[in-house]
Amino acid sequence: MQFDAVLLLSFGGPEGPEQVRPFLENVTRGRGVPAERLDAVAEHYLHFGGVSPINGINRTLIAELEAQQELPVYFGNRNWEPYVEDAVTAMRDNGVRRAAVFATSAWSGYSSCTQYVEDIARARRAAGRDAPELVKLRPYFDHPLFVEMFADAITAAAATVRGDARLVFTAHSIPTAADRRCGPNLYSRQVAYATRLVAAAAGYCDFDLAWQSRSGPPQVPWLEPDVTDQLTGLAGAGINAVIVCPIGFVADHIEVVWDLDHELRLQAEAAGIAYARASTPNADPRFARLARGLIDELRYGRIPARVSGPDPVPGCLSSINGQPCRPPHCVASVSPARPSAGSP
């Protein structure tokens, strides 16, 4: 399978204070999120000057990917400029016939995979009859470079705290009903499997997995334990240092720089716990190599690169033109409330 271009498909984020509220309205449209909730989340962005780190990180990643291979790379987002519809229309106008789509989410499930498939279908409709064929690359939660980047980040973070620090992985929580209906439990099982792979690569036998950034009505069950509750429990058990690894995120979303670097760090300091946060891949050159490797799997018919571990968890396959890659695993059975301003 040959490609004329690559599309980096991401979530999007504001790049100035005046963009924050319109961005959040895009994210939550049709979900009945109260205005006061939007105001609260807006403050997280305004704390950083109204700028999400994600677009800048993605532009650097695109430059790295263009340096590593010969195909032009287009940039499209779901919720803010540059929109995916505009990117696909530009591809059409530039004569692109087939493009590989690399989404900035490593997982299967509705929020982390199927919504990107829906983005592809919507963008092709907007581009019309001459829209390019769009091939979404497979999820990569068990790719050797994904595991390597997080393992190295844990090692680097561990060097900043005392040697007996407890390792805590985090990923974005979702409603348990949404998790059951996709897979079932494909997202949470993939996250748990990836934590085992990364922990082993980093040399850890004991670790915790917690979930972060939930919202919505308290009566609606979400994946647990919440990382704030987990930290409270660790403090009660006498743990005096933690390394937090946000394995659910491939870049520094607001949920990372606010929920972890700000709120969770303050909680740890108040409890007398030394705190270190492992880096996400962001624009690490290895992340671009990972994307290039996924493209080459399809271009040259290569066997998918995966780290083998006990009790492996299946993932979705590549998909074409917004068609579900594996319907039992990636169905829009529910539209879970957007947890805050991001997505797993």
Curated annotation (Swiss-Prot):
Catalytic activity as recorded in UniProt: Fe-coproporphyrin III + 2 H(+) = coproporphyrin III + Fe(2+)
Binding note for cofactor: Binds 1 [2Fe-2S] cluster.
GO cellular component: cytoplasm; plasma membrane
Iron among keywords: yes
Keyword Iron-sulfur: yes
Gene Ontology terms for molecular function: 2 iron, 2 sulfur cluster binding; ferrochelatase activity; metal ion binding
Location in or out of the cell: Cytoplasm
The organism's place on the tree of life at top rank: Bacteria
Secretion signal span: none
Protein EC: 4.99.1.9
Cofactor: [2Fe-2S] cluster
Enzyme's top EC category: lyase
Keywords (A to Z) from UniProt: 2Fe-2S, Cytoplasm, Heme biosynthesis, Iron, Iron-sulfur, Lyase, Metal-binding, Porphyrin biosynthesis
Matches recorded under HAMAP family: Ferrochelatase
Family membership: Belongs to the ferrochelatase family.
Additional facts recorded: Was identified as a high-confidence drug target.
Name this protein carries in UniProt: Coproporphyrin III ferrochelatase
Source organism of this protein record: Mycobacterium tuberculosis (strain ATCC 25618 / H37Rv)
Gene that this sequence comes from: cpfC
